[in-house]
Amino acid sequence: CEQKILKAYEDLPDADIIIFDLHNKPTKLKPKIYLPKRLEMLRVCSCQITFKRASIIDNKLIFDVKLGAGTGNGAGEENKFLLDCYDKGLKIYHVPEKIAVMTENESTWFTGFDADFFYKQGMSTRYILGFGLSCTYGLYYAISKHNQYKKDISIFGALKNILSGIFDNKLTKKI
């Protein structure tokens, strides 16, 4: 795995960040080497991300402490990090090489697809994407993930809680 990562940076010397694939988690990214678009950053989990440390330090980029496990605000810290990097103009590539296996352990924050989960999803989405785009993404999320949560909450219940999280705007960064 280390050799795959080093070779990718050797082959892509202008890359600041490279997103890889995982052995046991299908990706929604294209199966080729390319520069993903902004919204594709929402399809990435943290264990897929590698970066040049100097690029992150030089651009004063950090993971947002308001998001992630332990914050009570929901997940998405890796997506916000990638979007911040994208907005700063860093070169972010996807290389369809599998570098790791994601082990499924008990989550420190996910307790099921309940009203609170969807509320926090709306809250973090608003914080990351702003109001307009978060409303559109919230609708997309409720529809596209329906098969995963339909035993726990209705699509209307999920959407209602997502929109409540978006409108309450408790993280108050983006308008």
Question: Predicted segment positions?
Answer:
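Alpha-helical elements of Rossmann-like donor-binding domains used by nucleotide-donor carbohydrate transfer enzymes
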Residues: 3-7, 80-84, 120-123
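Non-catalytic, C-terminal membrane-associated alpha-helical segments of glycosyltransferases
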Residues: 112-175
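A conserved hydrophobic position in a structured secondary element of the catalytic/binding core
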Residues: 51, 77, 95
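Acidic donor-binding loop at a coil-to-helix junction in glycosyltransferase catalytic cores
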Residues: 68-83
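Conserved donor NDP-sugar-binding/catalytic core segment of glycosyltransferases
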Residues: 1-38
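Short, well-ordered alpha-helical scaffold segment located
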Residues: 54-59, 99
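A recurrent flexible, glycine/aromatic-enriched loop bordering the glycosyltransferase active site
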Residues: 34-56, 72-74
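Catalytic beta-strand/loop signature of glycosyltransferases that borders the donor
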Residues: 63, 89-103, 113-114, 133
